[in-house]
């Protein structure tokens, strides 16, 4: 399973999401891929007001504010598909 975190520097919610995902990684088996939306104009346009955004195996799962329970539920849904 690959979890992609769409983020950008200076985004405190993105920093919180990264830390949360790093903590969850201790109990869940996934590869974390972080993408800075400022490096791609299309991604910036798509996500700039929504970050942080988490995608699981390419499917958007969470955005904005979320907690560990939300992440674990999204991971479980991703494993079920």
Identify the meaning behind each predicted range:
Residues 58-81:
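Non-catalytic, surface beta->alpha helical segment in thiol-disulfide oxidoreductase systems
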Residues 16-19, 46, 66:
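Generic recognition of short, well-ordered alpha-helical segments
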Residues 27, 44, 65-67:
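N-terminal, polar/charged subdomain of small-to-medium soluble alpha/beta proteins
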Residues 48-54:
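Structural micro-motif
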Residues 30-41:
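Thiol-based oxidoreductase modules, predominantly thioredoxin-like and allied folds used
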Residues 8-10, 41, 51:
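A short, glycine- and basic residue-enriched loop/turn
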Residues 1-23:
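Local sequence-structure signature of Cys/Sec-based thiol-disulfide redox active-site neighborhoods
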